[in-house]
Amino acid sequence: MAAAALRDQLTALLSSMFSQGLVDEQFQQLQMLQDEGGTPGFVSEVVTLFCDDADRIINEIATLLEQPVVNFDKVDAYVHQLKGSSASVGAQKVKFTCMQFRQFCQDKSRDGCLMALAVVRNDFYDLRNKFQTMLQLEQQIQAYDPKQQ
Amino acid sequence: MTVVDAESRFHVLAVDDSLIDRKLIEMLLKNSSYQVTTVDSGSKALELLGLRDEGDDSSSSPSSSSPDHQEIDVNLIITDYCMPGMTGYDLLKRVKGSSSLKDIPVVIMSSENVPARINRCLEDGAEEFFLKPVKLADMKKLKSHLLKRKQQLPMAAAAPDKPPHKPDEAAASAAAIAEAATAQTDGIISDCSCSGSSKRKAAAMEQEVISSPDQRTKPRLSSTSSGLAVET
């Protein structure tokens, strides 16, 4: 019964992530590919890659924005990368924030970029927490019933 | 580079500089039972295809079929547009400019919906343009390009040294075009007429708009039925 409770928790978490707009149908597609392809670790692998990648990009952007003369094209290239990764995993909110961020890059506004960076960072940390909880729950569920997934 | 599922019929070479996107496209292709090889750059793709040198491999000369033989047999190339160094468009031009590779269908993917870019790719020989993130429904569209090539393949297999533009082969392609058109497939094979490219462009642009709530089970039937139907 504990496994069922964990599954309920996971379902509730995922539906809240959807309803809050953190993730979109692309994320659903990843789950579907995993389930249909019989490849249990796929979502976990892609989500982990995304989190590492996003973390690295956000730090790179922060460093660039600290420079006395900001290279906005370079910032924009990083934001574009992050937007692409977000779109691929279905991290909708981060993706939308990146779209706004790019506008500030085009306007060459350091203040705008710093604000956008704070928002992106916040959105990303929030999502990463949820992803981590999701992966933990999945692991716990699998530990109960290894044949299930 | 990863090779998976060697049993399946069609071999797709996927080119993307993003690891996440390579994982995703590989998974999508595997799910659609294609054999997949992924590389992270256009130059690695060309290397794999046996096209090494930077110089033009003289596509004008009909006798140049032997020097750049294919290292592996690839039925279709799907490439990202925006990559550092060689872009997907550069790769397309190299493939279409090579006498030995020009018949391999090329599909371009991009996260940006830039009509001029989409048109340029389609007019210069790309079979299809997918907006990222690529969906399972997009994979179904690949089949029609692969099947079209299959129809043309027996001739190439029978006489591999044949110059690319012999009149009888051209006639055969024309016949294949006519056949494909009557069979209600996505008619245009190698030449991108305006109507064909705009139709595909429309299909590509439509992708950003369409979003059905039950995509999980029935992914975007609307875009497959809008002029891209294969089955007869």
UniProtKB/Swiss-Prot annotation, chain A:
Recorded GO CC terms: cytoplasm; cytosol; nucleus
Compartment(s) where it occurs, according to its Swiss-Prot or TrEMBL record: Cytoplasm, Cytosol; Nucleus
* Protein source organism: Oryza sativa subsp. japonica
**Domain notes per entry:** Histidine-containing phosphotransfer domain (HPt) contains an active histidine that mediates the phosphotransfer.
**Domain HPt per the UniProt entry, residue ranges:** 39-144
MF (Gene Ontology): histidine phosphotransfer kinase activity; protein histidine kinase binding
The yes or no answer to whether the keyword Nucleus is present is yes
The identity of this protein, by name, is: Histidine-containing phosphotransfer protein 2
Summed up, the tissue specificity of this protein is: Widely expressed.
Curated annotation (Swiss-Prot), chain B:
What keywords were assigned to this record? Cytokinin signaling pathway, Nucleus, Phosphoprotein, Transcription, Transcription regulation, Two-component regulatory system
The entry's cellular-component GO terms read: nucleus
4-aspartylphosphate PTM positions: 80
The family database entries (InterPro entries) matched by this protein are listed as: ARR-like, CheY-like_superfamily, Sig_transdc_resp-reg_receiver
An individual GO BP term:
cytokinin-activated signaling pathway
Let me know which tissues express this protein, per UniProt: Expressed in roots, leaf blades, leaf sheaths, shoot apex, flowers and panicles.
Q: What is the induction comment?
A: By cytokinin in roots, shoots and leaves.
Domain Response regulatory span(s) in chain numbering: 11-147
* CDD domains in UniProt: REC_typeA_ARR (cd17581)
**Entry comment on modification after translation:** Two-component system major event consists of a His-to-Asp phosphorelay between a sensor histidine kinase (HK) and a response regulator (RR). In plants, the His-to-Asp phosphorelay involves an additional intermediate named Histidine-containing phosphotransfer protein (HPt). This multistep phosphorelay consists of a His-Asp-His-Asp sequential transfer of a phosphate group between first a His and an Asp of the HK protein, followed by the transfer to a conserved His of the HPt protein and finally the transfer to an Asp in the receiver domain of the RR protein.
Annotated compartments: Nucleus
Main subcellular location: nucleus
What are the Polar residues biased-composition ranges?
A: 209-232
This protein's source sits in the domain of life called: Eukaryota
Region feature Disordered, mapped onto this chain: 153-174, 202-232
PANTHER family on file: TWO-COMPONENT RESPONSE REGULATOR, TWO-COMPONENT RESPONSE REGULATOR ORR4
Role summary: Functions as a response regulator involved in His-to-Asp phosphorelay signal transduction system. Phosphorylation of the Asp residue in the receiver domain activates the ability of the protein to promote the transcription of target genes. Type-A response regulators seem to act as negative regulators of the cytokinin signaling.
**Can you tell me which family this protein belongs to?**
Belongs to the ARR family. Type-A subfamily.
What this protein is called in its record is: Two-component response regulator ORR4
Organism source for this protein?
Oryza sativa subsp. japonica
Its taxonomic path starts at: Eukaryota, Viridiplantae, Streptophyta, Embryophyta, Tracheophyta
- Gene from which the chain derives: RR4
